[in-house]
C-alpha cells in the first residue's frame, strides 16, 4: 500500500461512517449489503468509489435513462461514470485528491439514492 497516513485514516473513517464491515485495509476493497455492492479502490494516488445496484431485470434503456437524469450538481460537480453490467447498474467516481471521508460518504449515499431512483426493484 502506497498511501499516506491521512488517506489511511480517511479510508478507515469512510468505512466506519458508511456502516461497512471493518476489514484489513487494502488497495481494493469490496462490500455486499443487500442489493448493493460497494467498491473502494486506491490506485495511483486516487480513491475510486463504485456502487452497483444488483437487478434481476434490466431494461436496455436503463443506461440512457440514467444518463439523461444524471445532474452533476447533485454530486458536487464530481463526474460519475454510469454503466450497465450483466446483473446491475453501476456508478463510479474518483473524488478530488484533497477530499476527505465526509465527501466520499456523501458521494456514496448520493450514488445509492440515484441508482435506486433509476432502477425497478424486482
UniProtKB/Swiss-Prot annotation:
Name of this protein = Secretion system apparatus protein SsaM
> What are the recorded Gene Ontology BP terms?
protein transport
Q: List the induction conditions.
A: Induced when grown in an acidic environment. Repressed by methyl-3,4-dephostatin.
Q: Keywords on this record?
A: Protein transport, Transport
Q: Which gene encodes it?
A: ssaM
Question: What's the domain of life for this entry?
Answer: Bacteria
Amino acid at each position: 500500500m502506497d498511501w499516506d497516513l491521512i488517506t489511511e485514516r480517511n479510508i478507515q473513517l469512510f468505512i466506519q461512517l458508511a456502516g461497512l464491515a471493518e476489514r484489513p485495509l487494502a488497495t481494493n476493497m469490496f462490500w455486499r449489503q443487500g442489493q448493493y455492492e460497494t467498491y473502494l479502490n486506491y490506485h495511483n494516488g486516487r480513491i475510486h468509489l463504485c456502487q452497483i445496484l444488483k437487478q434481476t431485470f434490466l431494461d436496455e434503456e436503463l443506461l440512457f435513462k440514467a444518463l439523461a437524469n444524471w445532474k452533476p450538481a447533485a454530486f458536487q460537480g464530481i463526474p460519475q461514470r454510469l454503466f450497465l453490467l450483466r446483473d446491475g447498474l453501476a456508478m463510479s467516481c474518483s473524488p478530488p485528491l484533497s477530499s476527505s471521508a465526509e465527501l466520499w460518504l456523501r458521494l456514496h449515499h448520493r450514488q445509492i439514492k440515484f441508482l435506486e431512483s433509476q432502477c425497478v426493484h424486482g
